[in-house]
Amino acid sequence: MIELIEININNPFNNDLITIDYLNKIATINNQSYNVKPGYLNYITHTLTYWQNEYGTKNGIDIEEFTIKVYDDNKKITTFHGKGVYPSNYQEFKTIIKEPNYEWKRKIN
């Protein structure tokens, strides 16, 4: 089971450190804490899995990059890193954490 996730985003517009404490259902964005609804934790996990699959193996030369560390209950750390990429839904991801009544729309192609 996931206990904690750390997300570090670096690009010219965002230098964010996000932590998500699954046990206490608290997310922190640059030292500002937010309570996270349990259902949103599933969305967060789904989004991070998408980022890992879509961006996590890229190794470009751009200044945009992200690193995500996932800590499980056995204290195992899984890390993935994307460089030269930037998750397209990152701003919405932050909005979902910050605004507890935000309703995201799932895009189906």
Where are each of the predicted segments found?
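Generic short beta-strand segments
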Residues: 46-50
